[in-house]
């Protein structure tokens, strides 16, 4: 019989860890080699699959070794080929998860089938789906996907449930950097904002040392070690060791005998790297982490004075220069009470305990990293869920058709921060068909966005008249890449003014279209009920607005629109006065037949015109 325990897994880019609740405390489970973390590396050799330290030791010398597969999670079409067989990132990740699962089972003494797995805060919908799929392949029922900084805060906050605090989590791992602002209070953990750099981590610090060693050796001996795979493997191991040593000592000795051979025999590499030199080599990497911290604070609408605690997470935060920079930037001494390599897995185990009921009075509220919405009339991106909204969440809005007798609508689902649909990322498209024939603006189509506890998106559209419904779950091949998230955030900042102007232009054109449509409808209704001169005056004002629209001159469009509005208002007043006169002349004071104001089209004021494509029966499949 399988254990009911839910293990917590930190599936990292460079290293992974697994933990489980024992009593009221989370505990890291050591791997068969006695280490508390396991390298996220898989190698294939002689038909055998190897995971962890043994695979890492052959990362460069064995071409069938795969590292940092996490950076490709959710990437559509990406595969690695080994001995003629192609593997997806989910399959490689599943091999790492299976290894963690196996030694967790050995420790617990029972079969494990359930897990909570962590992901970087910036992982999008596709990447979260891919992580869940990897768990399924590994034989795990993934009960929850949670953000890494959130998990580490959960580990930190377990003993501080009676405190109300705002926490900044600085998470510098092997391959990614995340910063999150969280609020703790009454056992509730709420993420206020997230930010980061998805291509920055400890591997970059190792590479700086490797480049320094390679350049120095080439200058001294005229030999380029970057062309020698065996030498590169030794350099990589030595660079990582030197980096770790420099967290505790001022100088690191790097000794690699027989690293290469020259005309006069074997060549040896002997170097001393001081902490000051290391800081100089890696200063640009440390500086790159500052802006995401400032961005996260800005998104949370906070200052450093509002922050109560600063937590360091990820093995790379052991670097003294990183700790010093965080202290200077925030003005606060970072909290070192949690092992930065283990905090995420511990937090995941606590979340597992919450789900099984072993841990009580703790609620975890995560957020969605980017805004979600659909394309509406004029190519506008209409947001339904803003970024940094707490999940799980659901939001609905009523939309309508853009043409008379429109039989179907296309729902274009988007993710991003720009006002225009074309500048954001398409997540998916689906169609709602068999809409009864009706004038534009009459059908009421309810679009609903649901984001579940794992951050996975479901979108539905329902015709409120027929209750016909269509929906889509965003699949993993339609998500954003890390670069796209960063590009979209930067684009949103750089093009803010131009975007605002473009959106105002589209909004005005949409208003003009709606005005012209409504005026034509009103003029038909009042014909014969008001003087012909008034009708002609309104038609003339309408034609002037049409000309202004064709010219594209925004100022002229505004002026002509206002002029037409005034004419129609005057027309409505006369119609109303005539109706009152008819009412007064009715027998025994009975009301006469009053005409509705021509500007009432029977729509809710909050209804948004959708840019829904007209689909003829021939187009339907």
From Swiss-Prot:
Residue numbers carrying Phosphothreonine: 176
Biased composition (Low complexity): 588-601
Molecular-function GO terms, alphabetical: ATP binding; ATP-dependent protein folding chaperone; unfolded protein binding
Bias kind Basic and acidic residues: ranges: 486-508, 610-621
Tagged with keyword ATP-binding: yes
Inducing factors: By stress conditions e.g. heat shock.
Keyword ATP-binding: yes
Record keywords, A-Z: ATP-binding, Chaperone, Nucleotide-binding, Phosphoprotein, Stress response
Annotated InterPro entries: ATPase_NBD, Chaperone_DnaK, Heat_shock_70_CS, HSP70_C_sf, HSP70_peptide-bd_sf, Hsp_70_fam
Pfam families: HSP70
PROSITE patterns assigned to the protein according to its UniProt record, in alphabetical order: HSP70_1, HSP70_2, HSP70_3
Domain of life: Bacteria
Disordered as annotated region, ranges: 476-508, 521-559, 578-621
Role of this protein: Acts as a chaperone.
Similarity field: Belongs to the heat shock protein 70 family.
Annotated protein name in UniProt: Chaperone protein DnaK
């Amino acid at each position: 019989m399988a254990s009911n325990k839910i293990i917590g897994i930190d599936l990292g880019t460079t290293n992974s860890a697994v933990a489980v609740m024992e009593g009221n405390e989370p505990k890291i489970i050591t791997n068969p080699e006695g280490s508390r973390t396991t390298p996220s590396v898989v190698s294939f050799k002689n038909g055998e699959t190897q995971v962890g330290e043994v695979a890492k030791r052959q990362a460069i010398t064995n071409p069938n070794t795969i590292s940092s597969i996490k950076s490709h999670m959710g990437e559509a079409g990406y595969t690695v080929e080994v001995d003629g067989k192609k593997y997806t990132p989910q399959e490689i990740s599943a091999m790492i998860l299976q290894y963690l699962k196996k030694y967790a089972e050995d420790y617990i003494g029972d079969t494990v089938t359930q897990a909570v797995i962590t992901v970087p805060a910036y992982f999008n919908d596709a990447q979260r789906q891919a992580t869940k799929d990897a768990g399924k392949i590994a034989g795990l029922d993934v009960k929850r996907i949670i953000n890494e900084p959130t998990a580490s805060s959960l580990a930190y906050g377990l003993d501080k449930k009676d405190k109300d605090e705002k926490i900044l989590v600085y998470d510098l791992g092997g391959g990614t950097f995340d910063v999150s602002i969280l609020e703790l209070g009454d056992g509730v953990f709420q993420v206020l904002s997230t930010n980061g750099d998805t291509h920055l981590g400890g591997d970059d610090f190792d590479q700086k040392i490797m480049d320094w060693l390679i350049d120095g050796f080439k200058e001294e001996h005229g030999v380029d070690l970057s062309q020698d795979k065996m030498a590169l493997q030794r350099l990589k191991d030595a660079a990582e060791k030197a980096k770790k040593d420099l967290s505790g000592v001022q100088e690191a000795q790097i000794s690699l005998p027989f690293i290469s051979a020259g005309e006069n025999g074997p060549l040896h590499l002997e170097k001393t790297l001081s902490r000051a030199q290391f800081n100089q080599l890696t200063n640009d990497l440390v500086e790159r982490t500052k802006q995401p911290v400032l961005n996260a604070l800005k998104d949370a609408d906070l200052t450093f004075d509002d922050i109560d605690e600063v937590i360091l997470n990820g093995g790379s935060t052991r670097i003294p220069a990183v700790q010093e920079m965080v202290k200077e930037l925030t003005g606060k001494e970072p909290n070192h009470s949690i092992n930065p390599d283990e905090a995420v897995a511990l937090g995941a185990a606590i979340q597992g305990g919450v789900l099984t009921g072993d841990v009580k009075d703790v609620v975890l509220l995560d957020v969605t990293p980017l805004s979600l919405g659909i394309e509406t009339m004029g190519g506008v991106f209409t947001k339904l869920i803003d970024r940094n909204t707490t999940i799980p969440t659901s939001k609905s809005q009523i939309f309508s058709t853009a043409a008379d007798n429109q039989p179907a609508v296309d729902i274009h689902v988007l993710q991003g921060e720009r006002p225009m649909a074309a500048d954001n990322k398409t997540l998916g498209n689906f169609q709602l068909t068999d809409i009864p024939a009706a004038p534009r603006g009459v059908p009421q189509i309810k679009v609903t966005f649901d984001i579940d506890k794992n951050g996975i998106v479901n979108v539905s559209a329902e015709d409120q008249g027929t209750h016909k419904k269509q929906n889509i779950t965003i699949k993993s091949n339609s998500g954003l890449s890390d670069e796209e998230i960063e590009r979209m955030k930067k684009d949103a900042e750089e093009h803010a003014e131009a975007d605002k102007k473009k959106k105002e232009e589209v909004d005005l054109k949409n208003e003009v279209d709606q005005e012209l449509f409504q005026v034509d409808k009103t003029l038909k209704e009042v014909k014969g009920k008001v003087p012909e001169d008034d009708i002609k005056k309104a038609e003339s004002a309408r034609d002037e607005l049409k000309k202004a629209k064709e010219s594209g001159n925004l100022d002229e469009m505004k002026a002509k629109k206002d002029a037409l509005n005034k004419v129609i208002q005057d027309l409505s007043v006369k119609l109303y006065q005539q109706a009152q006169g008819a009412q007064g002349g009715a027998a025994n004071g009975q009301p006469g037949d009053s005409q509705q104001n021509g500007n009432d089209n029977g729509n809710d004021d909050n209804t948004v015109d959708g840019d829904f494509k007209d689909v003829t029966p021939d187009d339907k499949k």
